[in-house]
Curated annotation (Swiss-Prot):
The lineage of its organism: Eukaryota, Metazoa, Chordata, Craniata, Vertebrata. It comes from Bos taurus. One of its GO terms (biological process) is heme biosynthetic process. Keywords: Heme biosynthesis, Membrane, Mitochondrion, Transmembrane, Transmembrane helix. It is found in: Mitochondrion membrane. It comes from the Eukaryota. Required for normal heme biosynthesis. Belongs to the TMEM14 family. PANTHER family: TRANSMEMBRANE PROTEIN 14, 15 (PTHR12668), TRANSMEMBRANE PROTEIN 14C-RELATED (PTHR12668:SF4). It is a multi-pass membrane protein. One of its GO terms (cellular component) is mitochondrial membrane. This is Transmembrane protein 14C. The keyword Transmembrane applies. The chain crosses the membrane at residues 8-28, 33-53, 62-82, 87-107. Its main location: mitochondrion.
């Protein structure tokens, strides 16, 4: 019987993709609309998500920075999506952030506590 090698895609790789999505969203917002706040927020939250993913790759139990970053972004962009009803960019980032929060929660709860 083969040994379970864990999840199909390690969580930190999903996290790096999420961080790239957030950062590129800020860059695109700046390029299309000249929005400096969008650029700053995208790079800040993308950088924090990237750092959180790196921490996760070093220690799978160290989820807090990534969880707080994606949870905060889910809340902020969720409110923007609720008020604007525009999927791009608020709905996309809110949805991706919520999925990351759920994935982190499932991952944290499914690991045996030591």
């Amino acid at each position: 019987m083969p040994k379970d090698s864990g999840p199909l895609v390690p969580l930190h790789w999903l996290g790096f993709g999420y961080a790239a999505l957030v950062a590129s969203g800020g860059i695109i917002g700046y390029a299309k609309a000249g929005s400096v706040p969008s650029l700053a927020a995208g790079l800040l939250f993308g950088g924090l998500a990237g750092l959180g993913s790196y921490q996760l790759s070093q220690d799978p139990k160290n989820i807090w920075l990534f969880l707080v970053t994606s949870g905060t972004l889910a809340g902020i962009m969720g409110m923007r999506f609720y008020n604007s009803r525009k999927f791009m960019p608020a709905g996309l980032i809110a949805g991706a952030s919520l999925l990351m929060v759920v994935k982190l929660g499932i991952s944290a709860l499914s690991k045996p506590h030591q």
